[in-house]
Amino acid sequence: MGVLGTRAFQDGLNRVLFPPRLQTPGNKDEGPAWRAARILRRMREGRTAYVVVDAADDGSETVIGYAQWDRPKVPGQDTPQDEPAKEDDTPSSLDKEALARLNEILDKIAVTALGPDGFQSMWCRCSASLTNSYISNLNSDLVILSVDPDHQRRGAGRMLVQWGMEQAAAEGKKVFVIATPEGKPLYEAMGFEAIADPVDLLGFPNQAMLWIPTSYGS
């Protein structure tokens, strides 16, 4: 899954976070290992992972896409999100300053759209080949959505997003996403609407979008 995440991010932000100037023959595998470690840590912290697999001709199962969803905070109930964030060992190939700027920008976008307490009751947050997505107390939060480039346009991304939308709809909550140019058409096709001007994310335009289920407010 760490390799898949790296393949899904081969262009755009991946080149900013893992610039050529920091790449060496000795650290080429650090990026996938770092992504895998972050995924496993989040799983151990109690987050929910939803995985799409593709059965190969030989009967093996090849992961072609995955999404990782955070459930919303329940009032009065302690959750892993209440604990101090744990730092992962960052690889030498990662531009730590660029990662810090990225997180700062994403936080500002989410606070502007969701309000200062928006993160407190997030359902899920997503950063992916298709999108960077956030969902709040109004919403769901898709932590990670990645689809192997060799298997895109086969419906895997739609399945992963649809799953989270169904969870949010069951609770009568909205879904807020920050969509990359690659992900925007998918979200538009699934009923999301732009709610603000595009935002520059380290040189790449991203669009804040919102989906409101028919059950919202009922």
Residue ranges of predicted features:
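Structural signal for hydrophobic/aromatic residues that build the beta-strand cores
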Residues: 52, 142-145, 164, 175, ...
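Active-site rim helix/loop that mediates acceptor-substrate recognition in acyltransferases
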Residues: 13, 18-49, 55-58, 68
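Conserved acyl-donor/pantetheine-binding loop and adjacent beta-alpha core of acyl/acetyltransferases
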Residues: 46, 60-152, 200-202, 217
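C-terminal helix/juxtamembrane-tail motif
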Residues: 205-218
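Conserved acetyl-CoA pyrophosphate-binding loop and the N-cap/start of the following alpha-helix
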Residues: 151, 155-160
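Conserved active-site alpha-helix within GNAT-family acetyltransferase domains
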Residues: 158, 170-172, 181-203
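Conserved GNAT acetyl-CoA-binding A-motif
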Residues: 120-124, 138-140, 167-179
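A short beta-loop-alpha structural element at the N-terminal edge
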Residues: 1-14
